[in-house]
């Protein structure tokens, strides 16, 4: 999570991602091999390509109060006190409305980002190597236990459930041992 000052510094300035500062501060502790991809992936402000409004709710570790950074991407931003049960950060995007068809019969459809698969694909494509876990609730299905009194004609029943899943790998393929990388990982890369 971030304090109000960190929200101001990291999100309030378009050209500042915090990466270079982090690299400088931590180079001595971690040696010269500090590999940094922006703390917020490839360009936090790219969110406004698909969102009409962005809200970041963040509570720094050890702080009693959370802070809320909000912007429509046009007229600045606000930072106010807010609430969050635990430390961490939530980024909430209000997607733009789908565009009407143009003369060529094409339109931008932002609702494609609302599918679980679409969102996971975007995260893995653009933020797979962010060093912090990016988690999302995913829908899964599992077989219910077979009742003890079920007959030979029993047909398995399934139930849907939600589970929090880490979507990004957090470790770039080039930082892994070759023995830990499967062929499918190479193919995807």
Question: Where are the regions a protein language model picked out?
Answer:
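GHKL (Bergerat-fold) ATPase N-terminal catalytic module, capturing the glycine-rich phosphate-binding loop
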Residues: 1-109, 121, 144
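GHKL/Bergerat-fold ATPase module in large chromosome/replication-associated machines
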Residues: 36, 57-75, 98-101, 105-112, ...
């Amino acid at each position: 999570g971030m304090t109000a000052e960190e929200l101001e510094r990291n999100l309030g300035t378009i050209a500042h991602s915090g990466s270079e500062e982090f690299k400088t501060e931590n180079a001595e502790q971690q040696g010269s091999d500090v590999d940094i991809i922006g703390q917020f992936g490839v360009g936090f402000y790219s969110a406004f390509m698909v969102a009409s409004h962005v809200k970041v709710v963040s509570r720094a570790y050890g702080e009693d109060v959370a802070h809320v950074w909000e912007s429509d991407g046009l007229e600045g931003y606000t930072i106010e006190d807010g609430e969050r049960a635990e430390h961490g950060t939530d980024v909430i995007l209000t997607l733009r409305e789908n565009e009407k068809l143009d003369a060529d019969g094409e339109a931008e459809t932002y609702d494609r980002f609302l599918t679980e698969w679409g969102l996971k694909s975007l995260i893995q494509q653009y933020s797979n190597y962010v060093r912090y876990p990016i988690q999302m609730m995913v829908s899964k299905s599992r077989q219910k236990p077979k009742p003890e009194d079920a007959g030979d004609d029993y047909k398995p029943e399934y139930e849907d459930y939600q589970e929090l899943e880490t979507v990004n790998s957090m470790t770039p393929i080039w930082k892994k041992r070759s023995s830990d990388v499967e062929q499918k990982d190479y193919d995807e890369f």
